[in-house]
Curated annotation (Swiss-Prot):
Family: Belongs to the TolB family.
SUPFAM superfamilies associated with the record: TolB, N-terminal domain (SSF52964), Tricorn protease N-terminal domain (SSF69304)
One cellular-component annotation, GO: periplasmic space
Organism: Rickettsia rickettsii (strain Sheila Smith)
InterPro entries on file: 6-blade_b-propeller_TolB-like, PD40, Tol-Pal_TolB, TolB_N
Function: Part of the Tol-Pal system, which plays a role in outer membrane invagination during cell division and is important for maintaining outer membrane integrity.
Protein name per UniProt: Tol-Pal system protein TolB
Localization: Periplasm
Superkingdom: Bacteria
UniProt GO BP: cell division; protein import
Length: 444
């Protein structure tokens, strides 16, 4: 929200310690921390409505993370609201609230709103973090996400991921199927369509910033175009006409290059394109199918899947195509690798066969080839689970999940999220069927 939402005050009071232990979200499942998000004080009716809505969004963000348990306002004892008083901590401890959020909303002469909040530790009776934001009314939801991000970061030690966007493919349930690129907040709010559904579209990807996306469009069965769309202006342009491409490019961390797979002469290989010159550089060779490339966060490595040894497995190579190393060694076929923004893990889809037929799995493994022979961990499975992508803090994975048709109901596809630990799986609500999610970085 840079240039739109800015922080006037970074810290209202200095705090050096607090009673709550920092939540480590890699160490299995822990009981959610009980938190009370109190009613925000408001100086007029418009501010009161805004404050009420913000409390709901903040509470929902924290609840969806699986790390916090918002306490019902019906059990609150203390009636005071706002940030200008010290809470009656005993009253909050009585309802088992370890954390307390107080806030206030004021309407300014400019028409904007000043939003303040304080996070309290009720056990030590200390403030943990507090800030003041100034926002136009239409960005109140982003302000709420920003506050939830600050709370999440203070308690977990990791950056929050609530002020983010998801781009995905929306698919109508009626025949003929209509696929459109859609954009929404990370929690499913503010859904809007970016394409008109007149052509087949696939695999939307964010550019280095969240201001632009790229996607594949089938103008005809033989003509496949990669489009760039500016989300601020709505303008769209063709990046290139790439016969044989099946997935949109993934972009290097510096935004200067992108990698993609292109099928030619019976083989599919990884190519890197210089976005300034549009020149292609082939990175893989030999026979076989090499697809789904993804850069490491520092841009020096690329992970991809290849069937060069008969069964699709995952490989890592330098960004110039050298030093190829296999990193997957389990049974089954591997696909769709995605490198964590933190650089520590790679998420993937894995297809295994059993007596009941095929099972799709989403898993993670360590990104270091020397460490990953025994590091693979499956975090969810189903009839169809695919297309994993990471939250910007590398601690949540979003993916597409499908169900088959039956005599009672048609098949469907939805978007889900799950924690790195394999817990807290939840659906991200969309107006229609959805697939191919891609998570933006935290918005400016």
């Amino acid at each position: 929200m840079r240039n739109i939402i800015y922080f006037i005050l970074s810290l209202l009071f200095s705090v050096t310690s607090y009673a709550l232990e920092t939540i480590n979200i890699e160490h299995g499942r822990a009981d959610p921390t009980p938190i009370a998000v109190n009613k925000f004080y408001a100086d007029n009716s418009a501010a009161d409505v805004l404050g009420h809505d913000m409390v709901k969004v903040i509470s929902n963000d924290l609840k969806l993370s699986g790390l916090f348990r918002p306490i019902s306002a019906a059990s609150f004892i203390e009636e005071k609201t706002g940030i200008e008083y010290k809470p009656l901590f005993a009253a909050w401890r009585q309802i088992n609230a370890s954390l307390l959020v107080n806030g206030e909303v004021k309407k300014l002469e400019s028409g904007k709103f000043q939003i303040s909040f304080i996070l309290w530790d009720t056990l030590l009776e200390k403030q943990l973090v507090g800030e003041i934001l100034e926002v136009p009314k239409n960005l109140w939801r982003r302000a709420a996400h920003k506050i939830a991000d600050k709370i999440y970061e203070k308690i977990t030690g990791d950056a929050g991921y609530f002020d983010t966007k998801i781009v995905y493919v929306s698919e109508s349930s009626s025949l003929p199927k209509i696929k459109r690129i859609a954009l929404m907040d990370y929690d499913g709010a503010n859904n809007k369509y970016l394409t008109n559904g007149k052509s087949l579209v696939l695999t939307p990807r964010f550019a280095r910033s969240a201001d632009k996306i790229f996607y594949v469009s089938y103008a005809t069965k033989r003509r496949v175009l990669v489009y760039e769309k500016d989300l601020k202006t709505g303008k769209e342009s063709v990046v290139g006409d790439f016969p044989g491409i099946s997935f949109a490019p993934r972009f290097s961390p510096d935004g200067r290059k992108a990698v993609m797979s292109i099928a030619k002469n019976g083989s599919t290989h990884i190519y890197e394109i210089d976005l300034a010159t549009k020149r292609l550089h082939k990175l893989t060779d030999g026979f076989g199918i090499n697809t789904s490339p993804s850069y490491s966060p520092d841009g020096t490595k690329i992970v991809y899947n290849s069937d060069r040894n008969g069964v699709p497995q995952l490989y890592i190579m330098n960004s110039d195509g050298s030093d190829v190393q296999r990193i997957s060694f389990g049974g089954g076929s591997y696909a769709a690798p995605s490198w964590s923004p933190r650089g520590d893990y790679i998420a993937f889809t894995k297809i295994t066969k059993g007596d009941g037929g095929k099972t799709f799995n989403i898993g993670i493994m360590k990104a270091c080839p020397q460490d990953n022979k025994n590091s693979e961990r499956i975090i969810t499975s189903g009839y169809l689970v695919e297309s994993p992508c990471w939250s910007p803090n590398g601690r949540v994975i979003m993916f597409a999940k499908g169900w088959p048709s039956s005599s009672k109901a048609p098949g469907k596809n939805k978007i889900f999220a799950i924690d790195l630990t394999g817990h807290n799986e939840r659906e991200i609500m969309t107006p229609a069927d959805a697939s191919d999610p891609e998570w933006s970085g935290v918005l400016n």
